[in-house]
Structures are given as C-alpha cells and as structure tokens.
Swiss-Prot record:
Protein name: Galactokinase
Organism: Haemophilus influenzae (strain ATCC 51907 / DSM 11121 / KW20 / Rd)
Purpose: Catalyzes the transfer of the gamma-phosphate of ATP to D-galactose to form alpha-D-galactose-1-phosphate (Gal-1-P).
Keyword Cytoplasm: yes
Gene Ontology molecular function terms on file: ATP binding; galactokinase activity; magnesium ion binding
InterPro entries recorded: Galactokinase, Galactokinase_bac, Galactokinase_CS, GalKase_N, GHMP_kinase_C_dom, GHMP_kinase_C_sf, GHMP_kinase_N_dom, GHMP_knse_ATP-bd_CS
Site (Transition state stabilizer): 28
PROSITE patterns: GALACTOKINASE, GHMP_KINASES_ATP
Family stated for the protein in its record: Belongs to the GHMP kinase family. GalK subfamily.
Active site: 173
Length: 384
C-alpha cells in the first residue's frame, strides 16, 4: 500500500469520513554536491519515488490533532497559543513548520485532523524529515488558502529544521522535495535558488543502497562541519565558501592549513565539490557517464579524506558498486554522512550485477544487511 492510500484509509477509519486534503512530498537522493548547500553552493539531487503523505480535514477550532501512522503516535497542539516543543521528535518537524507559517501569516489559526504516512527509510540520508516538512507546509497552504510558492514552502521547512528542531541543515533537501521534476536531476544554486533541470539519461538507473548504519544529524558532527566551513569562509573574507574558486583556495591553502588544518580540509572539500557539480552538469549534457563516474568517485574520496564523514561500511559499498559499474557510471556516499546510503548511476543492464556483488559480500564482511532500491526521478510536492 502506498503512503497516500495508507494515510487516506487510516484517516477514514479514525474520523469516519474522507479527508478533504491529501498532499504528498517525496524524499530525495543527491547525485553530487554534498555539504555544499549551507555554503551557498551547488547541488544536483533528484526527488525519488519514496515520500510522505498527509491527509486531513478542517476542524471547527484551533487544535491540530496529528497521527503518525507508521509510529502509532499522536500529537496535539493549539494554533492560538505559542507552539511549544514536543517530546516526540517527529512532532517537532510538524510543529516547527506550522509555527513559522503562523509567523508569516498570524491569522492562520485553522485547526485540523491529520494522518501522516511515509515510506522514506528513517535515518537513511534520504530526507524523510524534508519530505515531512514540505508535505505539512503544502497542507497548511491548502488548508488556509495561503499565497505560498513551493520555494516558500521549502524555505519554511528549512527554517523549522534549523530553528525549531535544531539541525543546521542547508536548503537542498526541502527545495528538491518541493521542486523536483519527473525524470530529471535538478541542479540547484543554493544562493540564488535558481534551478536547472537535467534529464536522467534514459538507459541509466538511479540505485540507492542503504548501509543500515544508523545516523542522526542532530547529534553534533554535522553542526561542527558547518562551523568549520564558516571559519574557513571568514579566513578568505567571504560570505560563504561558494565565493572561493579552486585556484583561490590553492593559493592560500598552506596559510589556512597552518592556522587550522581541519578548516582547510573542510574547505578543500566544499570548494572542489562545487566545481564537481558544475562539471557533472556538463558531463550529463554530453551523456558522458565515464566523466560523471570519475566526478562521483572524486566526490566520495573528498568526503572520506577531507570532510571525514564516511564510515568503513559506506566506503566498502562504494568500492563494491564501482567494481561492477566500471567506466559506465559511478557511485558515492550520499546524504549527511556517518552512515546512511550510497547512490550509484549505472546502466539498467548492470543493476542486477551491482545488487549481486553487494548481496554476496556486504553482510558477510560487515555483519549488516543492506537495503537495495532502484529509484526513479520523481515530481516534487503535489496535491492528490
């Protein structure tokens, strides 16, 4: 059963009527451009065919009653008083989104009954949180007939995660969940918010392999990386590392390394990764999968050696995938790091071989069982 069907059926069962509003927002996978979004840089994700559905109906008061079907938990809060934090982590994503929409539209106090259901694997680096934020934002827009664009909804979700939940994420996850296009990757300029759709080559599959090493961005390491990047930007006298070219970095690399070796390593990753995203757009335009594969490999090496966010299990998955894919595509870690998933682009006729080499070796070596997904690039948030 899909999240949409599940949310609608459970709502019907709980409330004895059909929901007036159902919205659906997808998770995402980032093909290249990791930890560049909060440095005002470039990213190239696609929305995927896993996501979060929200079904609901107006109430005649100011109360939101929210049921998380997959967790069997309920949260309730009022819109006519200051919205406090919840003891349920998932509920804070919902509350944060509503709180900041209210900040923008103080008259938005419409109560609702909601059911949420999703199939984005939690803590996998595929943005279950952004899908939830964007779905709830779109639900609010429909509920209150608010003049919010999809970009507004995305940035509101990011604000909720930064300022209410407490994770210093960039804006990529929410933007792709809101703006994704079917069968396209979206190159996003995280400063101007301009987007450039790039078709996924027809003969290429988007493969995601979950290492099932759990990770949790809220616990420190992610925020530390962000601080180190800000330290490096300050050294270069710029607003963000986006403003430093590879040549400019190389000229002052030794000087920065002497001051702060870690900040230098983090900056080297971000500066070179931004260039890799721009090069990847050209490679895809030219249908040059060998070049794209080299860029993905360089991205992974940089995350491992300079940004230091991979773990041995992830490195091993990438190594296995690369053995099979060769020069016909690429593989790298995707997401915030410290576990989560790898992404691979490979011809459809290599999917089974990639699946087999991982199934034959990963669990035997690491003691963990992978989860293997073949995804399609999908549309962003929509009303059902």
């Amino acid at each position: 059963m899909t999240p949409i069907q599940n949310a609608q059926q459970i709502f019907n069962r709980q409330h004895k009527n059909l929901p007036e509003i159902t919205v659906y927002a997808p998770g995402r996978v980032n093909i290249i451009g990791e930890h560049t979004d909060y440095n005002d840089g470039f990213v190239m994700p696609c929305a995927i065919n896993f996501g979060t559905a929200v079904s609901g109906t107006k109430r005649d008061d100011h109360i939101w009653n929210v049921y998380a079907a997959d967790l069997d938990e309920t949260d309730e809060f009022s819109l006519n008083v200051e919205i406090p934090k919840s003891e349920h982590k998932w509920a804070n994503y919902v509350r944060g989104v509503v709180k900041f929409i209210q900040e923008r539209y103080p008259d938005f106090q419409q109560g609702a009954n909601l059911v949420i259901s999703g199939n984005v694997p939690l803590s996998s680096g595929l943005s279950s949180s952004a899908a939830l934020e964007v779905a709830v934002g779109k639900f609010c827009q429909q509920l209150g007939d608010l003049p919010l664009s999809h970009t507004d909804i995305a940035l509101n979700g990011q604000k909720a995660e930064n300022q209410f939940v407490g994770a210093n994420c960039g804006n990529m996850d929410q933007l792709i969940s809101a703006l994704g296009q079917e069968n396209h990757l979206l190159m996003i300029d995280c400063r101007s918010l301009e987007t450039t759709p790039t078709p996924v080559p027809q003969d290429v599959a988007v493969i995601i392999v979950n290492s099932n090493v759990p990770h949790d961005l809220v616990t420190g390491e992610y925020n530390t990386r962000r601080q180190q990047c800000e330290e490096a930007a300050k050294f270069f006298g710029v607003k963000a590392l986006r403003d430093v070219s590879v040549e400019q970095f190389q000229k002052r690399e030794a000087e920065l390394t002497a001051l702060s070796p870690l900040a230098a390593k983090r900056a080297r990753h971000v500066v070179t990764e931004n260039q890799r995203v721009l090069d990847a757009v050209e490679a895809l335009k030219n249908n040059d999968l060998t070049c794209l594969g080299k860029l993905m490999e360089a991205s992974h090496d940089s995350m491992r050696d300079d940004f230091e966010i991979t773990v041995p299990q992830i490195d091993y998955l990438v190594e296995l995938a690369q053995l099979v894919i060769g020069k016909s595509g690429g593989a790298r870690m995707t997401g915030g790091g410290f576990g989560g998933c790898i992404v691979a682009l490979a011809p459809h006729d290599k999917v089974d071989s990639v699946r087999k080499i991982i199934a034959d070796n990963y669990e035997k070596t690491t003691g963990l069982k992978e989860t293997f997904y073949v995804c399609t690039a999908s549309q962003g948030v929509r009303v059902i």
